[in-house]
Amino acid sequence: MKSNQTGFSAIEMMVVVAIIGILAMIAIPSQMGRIIKEQVVAAIPLADIAKEPIAASWKAAKTLPVDNKEAALPAAEKVVSNFVSALEVKDGVINITFGNKAHPKIAGKILSLRPAVIEESQVVPIAWVCGNAKAPNQMTIKGENKTNVPDEYLPQLCR
């Protein structure tokens, strides 16, 4: 007697489900890193509100604002966004603290944007050095780097 079987048997279906489950377990963690990195990148433009007054202070008096108040910004905890719980200016450095809807792996972590200047020429615009990156040639970085976001979550420009 010949059997005309159509469709999947229960065992074949379980094998397919197991393979899909294994592929999902591999894919989800690799996507998590990308999502966290996107949150870091999304937070960086918030620093633009502090860059202008810092650059103006350097150009006018060759000094950098010591805090948010001197940079004419609200208190650090009042400058927030979806992934940022505070934006602090300290000696010209912009420190972004991650929080609010940020992934737990970066919540409470800091990304610093430090001004790089040419000491002898205030006219040359400030270059902003992100995170652990190095200064452009002939420029001096001002302030302390407080970046403690793991390198794997920093964009290439900040490593």
Model-derived features with residue positions:
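N-terminal single-pass transmembrane signal-anchor helix
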Residues: 2-42, 46, 50
